[in-house]
């Protein structure tokens, strides 16, 4: 598996780090854009990458401003800058990959940015796997205990020097405002394909409230999946293989429909 990293400019000229993985010998049919969540960065999902590459994906993961290896103030420009950075990255991918299909896996904070991206760029008919979306309040702190249920997962997070233990108050307020606006007028999701995945013990996303909200969205055949005992990062938990398999299964099913 090949792994490279580089930088790309967002629409305002800020340099954002991204990395990508691919199997050049096996080849790939699709590109998965992985958008990190609260407390995380582009390298926070080590189990997801090989599973997607084995399924003939190229995986591209950016660091939002101030997170991971991206320089600058954490969350500079707010959710709007994140959404526009996703568009800039998609254009960069298209220039390199041509007609290969792009799909998005968006976690937590990244899910709010991805939904705003779809609203701002309605011509994009990209399918979206939404994981633990922060739609009902945004915390400032992101402790390992909030993200993880099992001890190994907690230790991996606490040992990560790029773990973002907190975000600025202004970013939290902006994310919260954006989430409320997205839920108040979800018409931009009319006919789109999205699936929602959440841990049943997530302290930040009440899954029953999320299920009710998803049921009101004008999506085409929405999917809602919960995972017992998982917290805010179900991708990295003990049942991460089942979570990732659920992503891949949904993408395959909806590709054919």
Predicted regions, residues:
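N-terminal cap/lid segment of alpha/beta-hydrolase-fold proteins
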Residues: 1-23
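Catalytic active-site module of serine/aspartate enzymes centered on a nucleophile-bearing elbow/loop
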Residues: 223-257
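Short beta-strand/loop motif that positions the catalytic acidic residue
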Residues: 196-198, 202
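Conserved alpha/beta-hydrolase
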Residues: 49-73
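Catalytic nucleophile-loop/oxyanion-hole region of alpha/beta-hydrolase
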Residues: 38-41, 67-99
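Conserved hydrolase catalytic core segment
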Residues: 101-127
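Serine-hydrolase catalytic-loop signature spanning alpha/beta hydrolases and amidase-signature enzymes
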Residues: 39-47, 59
